Amino acid sequence: MEKVRILGIVGSPRKDGNTAKLVEEALEATRAFPWVETDLFSIAGKKINHCVGCYRCMEKHQCVVPDGLYQFLDKYIPADAVLWGVPVFHMGVPSVVKALLDRFGCMTLMHFLTQGKDVPRFSKVCGVLVSGASHYGGQDLTLSYLANSCLLMNGVVVAGDSIRGDSYIGAAAWAGQWPNPFAKDNVLKDEKGIAAAKSVAIRVAEMARIVKAGKAALGSELPAEYSYTFNLEMPAKAKLIA
């Protein structure tokens, strides 16, 4: 039985915090399936620069800035599915996540379009998870942003079992409980949020298996865009056009 690879992405600059625990709980739920293989990428401690609009990616077919983006790509590219997890910052994603998505999205387009190919149809199955210091501090906005980003990257976004009271488009957990609203394990006290994250993760695993089996069964009947792969090398140094 071919494994389904699920990548958990911890999009928090805070190491081993609530978002990391939320993503790990979600990944653990998928490990009950013998056909699932999990991996993890954490943004914490990584240097990820913002896009400066130099357009060198049009010339080189990839971003010329050698930083944590390439560590991310090493794990993202082979994954069949991804579970995005972020904390809510100012009713949105952390700036480092925005920087990652800006460059990754642009580079994906330029890598293929500048070589005369159509936009790739990766069809990665995606689930989105957020943790916030309050119940209603922008969780829905952040979930929507992540879900739309996945759609923009030709992903297949799934939700949990919303009829049971889970979040409609992902999972939102509360991590701001008193008396210590900044504790790194507060999210584990939110039983409903953890249950929602596990529900999303299970649906991601199931759908990823369906998509992978379907692509394998159809094989050459599908357009070439479904089987594109990156051919990337870490740039030696950045040469930017201001």
Each language-model region and where it sits:
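Glycine-rich phosphate/pyrophosphate-binding loop and the adjoining helix
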Residues: 33, 156-242
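Short, glycine/serine-rich, charged loops/turns that create anion-binding
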Residues: 13-14, 45, 133-134
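Helix-loop-strand module that forms the ligand-binding subsite of alpha/beta enzymes
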Residues: 4, 60-169, 234-238
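N-terminal beta-loop-helix "entrance" segment that forms/cooperates
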Residues: 40-63
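N-terminal beta1-alpha1 ligand-phosphate binding loop
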Residues: 4-34
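Conserved beta-strand scaffold positions in the cores of enzyme catalytic domains, especially
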Residues: 8, 38-40, 157
